[in-house]
A protein has these predicted regions:
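Surface-exposed binding/hinge segments that line
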Residues: 76, 87, 121-164
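Structural transition elements
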Residues: 275, 309-342, 359
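Ligand-site clamp/hinge motif
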Residues: 201-246, 368-369, 377-379
């Protein structure tokens, strides 16, 4: 009898052990839908979140904002700062099984620099050429010294894609992207979901514990949270500050936040097509008046529960790059009215487009009320975020509210938005003196010299005001208690390597 019991137990155990282990699937609620899934062409913040899982970069950014190895294991600058040599990780495969090597890096960088649709051109404008110095070594030769290049390569400009897929798909690469990250593309249904699955040949696969990840765009923060609370989602990004207390009080959920390195802003159409031909786009005094009509501290308290900070520059007030000679202005409606009178207007109608998420809409409703006192009649146009960015690009807007998630080097918060040929200069503002200052800041290895250049540029921009900076918010996440290993980073990314979903 004992022998029979042992045999039965052994057979039962064998049958159980033969059953497949339940796949760990992670469902993440995003505030917006990503735009095109091509690192060369895209510009959305949520797109970068998806790329963090799908497309490894030459280098990454640590939570303390240091540049760290990823596809490149080491790098060195020439003494004159005119060449950057990078050694690549051995044995890395793209999702299509082809090798990630020096030739692939060269092909990707050249694609970023030459593809007509590429938004990476201004980020790589200092690069004269990139060459393979061996199977796993590349050399970037520069036109002039550029201390920002490493930071650029820690983002979309440094995401290496399969040359075979890029050549086959061309500008349609985003329909079936092939990269070298921990997860590979499965499917996308716009405005519904993006699905990725674990790449079994990933170079760091032993630290990937999730088998499948689904990103679901849910613009309404209340609905996002409700889906998390019901268990339909495992994690959400950009939790509304008003919901922070509810998450902290829920024993089944985990809360995480960190102050970001980006900004919230209004972009004025200065010279981007026919819609720039209006008083607000043509007269800086009206833009200055609009800015003075806004109480940034009140915005922080009303909309962000005190978790944000007011701002008037691309760098937050606690940043070493902030120009202290231009403090965040207090609200001054009378001065705003004076500027409007000086410009010859009592009232000015403005159409302001805003993404269709509750926090952004609430913020713009408060702004709408504030600026009305000075004489601005604002009508709000709500639209899906990717559509909003497309309208900005095409110049089909008058004033547009958008965020920038920030970059580890100050250049990333200003150059591409403001320079005459900037890759995402939707305002089409162009001032050769600003270009000169920002290009010189890129070329200097002396932070004190760079600070002087940024300060001088900020004085001009604070007067011309093509972008009206509103402030700097915190990134806030919420997740199920069984999701562990998440590290909050000031860049707002959700890095899935090392993250686990416990049974």
């Amino acid at each position: 009898m004992t022998r029979l019991l042992r045999l039965t137990t052994a057979l039962a155990f064998g049958a159980l052990s033969a059953l497949p282990v339940a796949a760990a699937e992670l469902k993440i609620g995003l505030q917006d839908d990503a735009d095109v899934l091509d690192p060369a062409q895209s510009r959305t913040f949520v797109g970068r979140i998806v790329y963090t899982a799908m497309c490894d970069k030459l280098v990454d950014v640590s939570p303390d904002l240091k540049i760290i190895p990823q596809l490149a294991t080491e790098w060195a600058w020439s003494e004159d700062g005119m060449a950057l040599t990078m050694k690549l990780r051995e044995g890395v495969k793209f999702h299509d099984g082809t090798d990630m090597d020096a030739a692939a890096v060269v092909a990707t960088i050249e694609r970023n620099m030459t593809l007509p649709e590429s938004r990476r051109k201004s980020e790589l404008s200092s690069v004269e050429k990139v060459e393979a110095a061996g199977p796993l070594e590349v050399v970037f030769t520069l036109k002039k010294p550029d201390v920002t290049l490493l930071a650029q390569l820690s983002d979309r400009a440094g995401m290496i894609v399969s040359p075979a897929a890029a050549e086959k798909l061309g500008a349609n690469f985003g329909s079936s992207p092939v990269c070298a990250g921990p997860f590979k593309f499965v499917e996308r249904i716009q405005q519904d979901r993006i699905v990725l699955e674990k790449f079994q040949d990933y170079w760091n696969k032993d630290n990937v514990f999730i088998d499948k990840v689904t990103y679901l765009p849910i613009p309404d923060s209340t609905v996002r949270l409700a889906n998390l609370q019901s268990g339909d989602l495992d994690m959400i990004e950009r939790l509304a500050p008003t919901d922070a207390a509810a998450v902290k009080a829920n024993a089944r959920l985990t809360y995480a936040d960190v102050v970001n390195i980006g900004y919230m802003a209004l972009y004025a159409n200065i010279a981007n097509g026919p819609r720039a031909d209006n008083p607000f786009g043509k007269d800086k005094r009206l833009r200055q008046a609009f800015s003075l009509s806004i109480d940034r501290d009140a915005l922080n308290q009303i909309v962000y529960e005190g978790t944000a900070v007011g701002g008037n520059q691309p760098f937050p007030p606690n940043s070493p790059w902030f120009n202290a000679a231009l403090p965040v202005p207090a609200r001054d409606v009378e001065k705003a009215k004076e500027l409007m009178q000086e410009a010859g207007y009592d009232r000015v109608p403005i159409e302001l487009q805003v993404a269709n998420n509750p926090v952004a809409q609430q913020m713009m409703q408060v702004v709408q009320s504030m600026v009305a006192e000075a004489g601005f009649d604002v009508s709000l146009k709500s639209t899906e975020f990717a559509t909003l960015l497309d309208e900005q690009t095409r110049g089909n807007y008058q004033l547009s509210r958008s965020d920038w998630s920030g970059r580890v080097d100050p250049d990333g918060n200003i150059h591409q938005f403001i320079t005459c040929n900037g890759g995402i200069n939707d305002t089409k503002y162009c001032n050769p003196e600003v270009d000169r200052l920002l290009n010189e800041a890129r070329a200097s290895t002396d932070d004190a010299v760079r600070k002087e250049k940024y300060d001088a540029a900020s004085v001009i921009l604070n007067d011309d005001m093509p972008i009206i900076y509103l402030g700097h918010q915190s990134w806030i996440w919420a997740m199920q208690k069984n999701v562990t290993g998440f590290v909050a980073s000031p860049d707002g990314m959700i890095r899935l390597v090392g993250l686990k979903k416990e049974d």
